[in-house]
């Protein structure tokens, strides 16, 4: 058998050795720090939920402010239209006085402005007498100003806010174990004997003897 010839390696072909060194403190901290890291993750999740809740509340406040401004503009426009109608529905009065030796007579003619011809306001023709005309004038001049209906909120946004608050309360809530009173065991105990005086015992023994006789 021939001899095994060892191949000589050059110094450049050799690979550097890897030396693994463990830090005992870091190793111990990693092995014993599971609870600590869990608490840190929980705190980070709670902070993230709080930030999201603040953003949702800010968006909701902005939407409410925009709705309020829109309602205010609509109300101002309605009031301006009412004032314009009041200015249009006017009456011209002409009065003429007649002087007599005994009394003074004043004749007044009232001519209402016809808005139905100009298609500004649809007035219905009067059916009754002067009382109906006065009622129509009052109803045309007085325009009720009712509050505009408030728009409903966004249901999806409110549901998201409620879910975020519920999860926040679930994280911050602590479980408390309550001890139930042992009423059943106390009820099974026999009643305690009360102390009696000598006179009471004599009376009881006397009654027992009489009953035996």
Swiss-Prot record:
Transmembrane segments: none annotated. Residues 130-139 have a biased composition (Acidic residues). Its main location: nucleus. Keywords: Coiled coil, Cytoplasm, Nucleus, RNA-binding, rRNA-binding. GO terms for cellular component: cytoplasm; nucleolus. One of its GO terms (molecular function) is rRNA binding. Residues 170-182 have a biased composition (Basic residues). The keyword Cytoplasm applies. The keyword RNA-binding applies. Residues 33-96 form a coiled coil. InterPro entries: Nucleolar_protein_12 (IPR019186). Residues 109-213 are annotated as: Disordered. It comes from the Eukaryota. It is found in: Nucleus, Nucleolus; Nucleus; Cytoplasm. Multifunctional RNA binding protein that plays a role in RNA metabolism and DNA maintenance. Participates in the resolution of DNA stress and the maintenance of genome integrity by localizing to sites of DNA insults. Also plays a role in proper nucleolar organization by limiting nucleolar size and regulating nucleolar number. Mechanistically, regulates the nucleolar levels of fibrillarin and nucleolin, two key players in pre-rRNA processing and ribosome assembly. Belongs to the RRP17 family. Interacts with KIAA1191. This is Nucleolar protein 12.
């Amino acid at each position: 058998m021939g001899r095994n010839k060892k191949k000589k390696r050059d110094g450049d072909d050799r690979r550097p050795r890897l030396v693994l060194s463990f830090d005992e403190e870091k190793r111990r901290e990693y092995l014993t720090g599971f609870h600590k890291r869990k608490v840190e993750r929980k705190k980070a999740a709670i902070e993230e939920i709080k930030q999201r809740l603040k953003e949702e509340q800010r968006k909701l406040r902005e939407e409410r402010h925009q709705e309020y401004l829109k309602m205010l503009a609509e109300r101002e426009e309605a009031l301006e239209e009412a004032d314009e109608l009041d200015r249009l529905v006017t009456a011209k009065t002409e009065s003429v006085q007649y002087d007599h030796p005994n009394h003074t007579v004043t004749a007044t003619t009232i001519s209402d402005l016809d808005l139905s011809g100009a298609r500004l306001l649809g007035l219905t023709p009067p059916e009754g007498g002067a009382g109906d005309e006065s009622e129509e004038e009052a109803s045309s001049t007085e325009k009720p100003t009712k509050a505009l209906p408030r728009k409903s909120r966004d249901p999806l946004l409110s549901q998201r806010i409620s879910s975020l608050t519920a999860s926040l309360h679930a994280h911050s809530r602590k479980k408390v174990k309550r001890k139930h009173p042992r009423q059943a065991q106390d009820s099974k105990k026999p009643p305690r004997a009360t102390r009696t005086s000598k006179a009471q015992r004599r009376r009881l023994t006397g009654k027992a003897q009489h009953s035996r006789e």
